[in-house]
Amino acid sequence: MDILLSILDATWKVIFIVFFFGFCIFIHEFGHMLAALWQGLHVERFSIGMGPVMWKIFTWRNVDFVLSWIPFGGYVALPQLDATDSPKTMQDEKLEPCKPWPRAVVAFAGPFFNILFGFVLAFIMWGVGLWENPKASSCIISSVPQSLPDYEKELSITDRLVAFDGEPTDLFADEICAKLEPGTTHSVTVKRGDKDVTFDMTTLANPEWEAGLRAGDRIVGVNGKHFTKGYEEFSMEYVFSGAYKVTVNAIRDGKPFDATYIPLRNPLMEGLGAPFFTATSPVALGGVHPNSPAAMAGLQAGDQLLQLNDTNIMGGKEFLELLAKMDGAPFSLLVTRNGKDMLLEGIRCPAPYTLHNFGAFFAVSVSSVVPDLPAKKAGIRRGDRILSVDGVEVLDSKQITEYIRSTEGKPMTINLVRNGKPLELKGVCSEKVEMEGGAVYLLGVTLSNSAPKVIGHPNPWAQFTRIVSQTWRTLSLLFSPITSRVTGRERGQATVKVEHMSGALGILTMMWYTLSSEGLRGGFSLIILITFSLAIMNLLPIPALDGCYILFSIIEIVIRRRLPYKLVNALVSIFFYLLLALIVYITFFDGRRIFRLLKFGSIKGVPPKVEKVTPDAPPAAQEKQNEQPVETKEEK
């Protein structure tokens, strides 16, 4: 039965990917065809699918509609758009060369139909809703490494250390270097195949540490720009800033400060300028008991805890420690509710200083459930909030992870909340799973300390402008080596490059994982992204793309004569092969990411460390779950 369900699960995903990804291409070509017929051009053939013709379906307005062997996308044959002064049909009949205006209309119609299709889907998802991160105006730094390992020489990010300075270890290099002084040299022994390789490594200074960032700092902005979606939005802004220097706007002990530094390329993130420090969105309350101190203070489910008096709250455990230090004295809490900061004052908590006595519980929620592991079999679902395990109050995901491992497969009782109703699961046993570097007991869930994702309802225009902004920023960073030379502006070395892009292979893989982890909502969200992006990319004025045909047509209208067809043909041919080479280049990196994902369980190529493996699964193992979202009706 499980095998049949797995086959059915894989089948619907394949059908979804092939149909909708192919439809993005199909609708593009369909737009070209309709515009060509409207402008009176000769349309030779319209194919559903690619490759050799399998079957001629029918003929309409002298256009052969055919079905091709590869059931993916489609194409339209328009001989009058070829760069020649004597276009011909397949029957060798001569045709009139296409004039500039009809050529521009036909070229624009393809991207235009992609945009129309995107808006149709965006309008539907406006009503249905899309997965979004809950609003959070800040994030909390949990750790900042003092030093970094040098991966530029002998050390590799996939190396597993067996000894450091002669002492046996099973830690990763970045974990050891985090507490070492920069510029110090150490002996490192790693396992490569069946051999132990020993060499010297000098630690590098971490610019984040030297700029003054520390664990417990609360980040409220980057480069002066504030965010509303917590750590995910912060990290995107950080990576896509493209600036030579980055300024992290933070708060410590109630006082704001700025940390400015030159970001380094992060080898653990494919050389992107991603932070080396770790941070999370603020810890959130999963609920508040009636008539409790928390309820009387005005706290509500979903509130994100930022500060107790002037001390930043790093997590649930730290909150209880701060609560105990108050020893019954009144205190204030700074919280975020629906994206707005609120100060609650005069709060008291009587002894003993536990969450139960305070009258609240944290939102340690299930982000995804792995098929064929105990959590799935026990009935745990995405969106469930875990309250306790074997009667032990849950403070954060790390606590649950450590407890699950300690049970070594013994039955557990898990208390959780689903749709506001308490639920108790008895006899849940973790399962021993062999992983890179050893075995670990897993429950089979991905946990989040912050509030779970919600279903938002962004209007179609908001969805479109967000994708246009993302695409524009990406293209700006890709072309920054050229633009920086022209403008003289310093650019960051840790920036987005061509190898960070995804081609068809990467997009298809991403769609599979998105369908597995976020279901149809996530899948349609990605299709909207793809069809809008396809339109934008095709409008670029690059030979062989639609945008260049539009540009050539505008030039011809202005100069009132046709551009030399040999020049146009040469440019189109050269750039066609350059684009083909670019696709091969990007596909190589897509393949490398997938290989690392399958081998290490990490798309970055870093094998998971057994002692730190959360009960998470790699994206490949995640599955579409019954969605138990928090609904928000706000339109943006």
Predicted ranges, named:
Residues 2-4, 8-10, 93-101, 270-296, ...:
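Functional transmembrane alpha-helices
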Residues 28, 67, 150, 158-161, ...:
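Terminal peptide-recognition signature
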Residues 8-90, 537-559:
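Small-residue-rich helix-interface/hinge motifs
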Residues 121, 125-163, 195-215, 269-301, ...:
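PDZ/PDZ-like groove recognition
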Residues 27, 74-143, 254, 319, ...:
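Internal alpha-helical transmembrane segments
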Residues 139-218, 334, 343-345, 406, ...:
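Low-complexity, proline/glycine-enriched hydrophobic segments characteristic of transmembrane helices
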